[in-house]
């Protein structure tokens, strides 16, 4: 029986991870007494008793918890960090098992895994294969308009939307300094900072990450079919091995519902193209709380603990 402690269990991601783990027969979740949630010693005791600790905390708090684990005597638990604190750290494995052919094995052998950001998951999923295939240059001026459900904004945003205090649709992070940009660049190989423009809509969960392209501006002037083939080739092996990323044909009605994958760990990629205009848009669809957060965390937990 694998013992798991979720540090930050009461938050949006922590609650969903707990719900998913509750369905797994070979896992025991160690919970802290709510009255002792701020008690450092109580937290330390649970960390010492766990085989794996999941950090669902703000970045600074996650760094503090890692330091606490480092000071534990004896064998230390594995860690999955859902914050942004360690995503580009060389001593941590990036928790996107479908990223490359050897990534699932790296996660399986890791002691410390950094869970990807939700937007970053979608962006990396569509950019990395196209760059690896040579269809998209590393210095290409990438634009990533994206939209998420309001649960991605944390408790205060959730309360504002559900109380009717928030707009139906809102662009945000317009200072163009979103915290997911460093990991997008790090794990795709982009050398030019992408123009990432996120927005939030009046729906709880769901996400679309879009990559619009003028095909004639790319080397080799590829077709939409070329993009689809490169994406499909990149994910064929991981999909056959049980990975959660699928490359699918464009929808017949040329529409895409951001909420269709809610409460799953799936990520779907489609290429929509107008060959006459030489335009294409590559779109990743996922649940921002699923493959974008708690679902990915549980996928990594299963690999790390051999479940």
What are these regions (language model features)?
Residues 266-268, 273-307:
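NAD(P)-dependent Rossmann-like dehydrogenase/reductase catalytic/cofactor-binding core
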Residues 18, 63, 124-131, 181-185, ...:
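Predominant activation on well-ordered alpha-helical scaffold segments within soluble catalytic domains
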Residues 135-136, 190, 307:
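Helix N-cap/coil-helix junction residues
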Residues 1-167, 172-174, 272-275:
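N-terminal Rossmann-like NAD(P) cofactor-binding subdomain of oxidoreductases
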Residues 12-44, 56, 141-146, 150-282:
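C-terminal substrate-binding/catalytic lobe of Rossmann-fold NAD(P)-dependent oxidoreductases
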Residues 118, 217, 288:
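Residue-level signal for short, function-critical loop segments
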Residues 122, 223-227, 293:
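Short amphipathic alpha-helical segments
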